[in-house]
Amino acid sequence: MAIHPTAIVEAGAQVDPSCEIGPFAVIGPLVRMGPGNSVGPHAVVTGRTTLGASNRIFPHAVIGGIPQDLKYRGEDTALVIGDRNTFREFATVNLGTAGGGGVTRIGSGGLFMASSHIGHDCQVGDGAIIANSVAIAGHVLIEDHVHFGGLSASHQFCRVGRLAFVGGMTGVAMDVAPYCTVAGARGELAGLNAIGMQRAGLTEEQIGRVKQAYKIVFRSSLGLAEAIAQLEAELAGHPETDHFIAFLKGSQRGITR
């Protein structure tokens, strides 16, 4: 284990011997770190935080800080992070709250750029790209391979579907359907994330079905319930459209249209 002599690893912390802890970094007593993690100078990993393998935490990031929630009263809550994530300078990720399930979760393979924030009780999937100064409020669900452009933000309790793309300086206040792009200060629908689907390996046939679903929901005069019924009648039975349908049916805040 490479621990700089100025770093503080508090008693009780479980840190794999292969980890690197940089100058003036602080590792709290409830932290558990798997193999190959690196924590940069002046970074803080605290709270009941569990990290998998090979995560990189850059200078001044704070991982596992208490929730920015006035209802929080010191309850024993947690943060669970997967493997191979990168948290750049001044990124912050908060613990969960008792009222929100108690656990904030980050998947694997994500990039959380400088000054980005993941709020309490968020559930972030694999392969997230969260650009500079993005602010994700509490209780937000971000599915796999979602991209938030710089200076964008999400309201509490929103859901952002798989392979969605949120443009820079966009405010998300309603759910963003899978495969879709939203842009603008008020988070307006801007089309499909065709490039993202191609990069993720969807076939032309699969992308074609997503396009059909998109037209039924967003380019017809149907209400959402009617559109979902048509999707179930015409496009059910395929993983990409089944997920699209399930996401729409599960919306509590409404869908960005």
From Swiss-Prot:
Catalytic activity annotation: a (3R)-hydroxyacyl-[ACP] + UDP-N-acetyl-alpha-D-glucosamine = a UDP-3-O-[(3R)-3-hydroxyacyl]-N-acetyl-alpha-D-glucosamine + holo-[ACP]
Keywords: Acyltransferase, Cytoplasm, Lipid A biosynthesis, Lipid biosynthesis, Lipid metabolism, Repeat, Transferase
EC code: 2.3.1.129
GO cellular component labels: cytoplasm; membrane
UniProt-recorded Gene Ontology molecular function terms: acyl-[acyl-carrier-protein]-UDP-N-acetylglucosamine O-acyltransferase activity
BP GO annotations: lipid A biosynthetic process
Subcellular location(s) of the protein: Cytoplasm
Keyword Cell cycle attributed: no
NCBIfam families linked to this entry: lipid_A_lpxA, PRK05289.1
Record text on subunit structure and interactions: Homotrimer.
Purpose of the protein: Involved in the biosynthesis of lipid A, a phosphorylated glycolipid that anchors the lipopolysaccharide to the outer membrane of the cell.
Family recorded in the similarity comment: Belongs to the transferase hexapeptide repeat family. LpxA subfamily.
Protein name per its UniProtKB record: Acyl-[acyl-carrier-protein]--UDP-N-acetylglucosamine O-acyltransferase
Species for this entry: Anaeromyxobacter sp. (strain K)
Gene from which the chain derives: lpxA
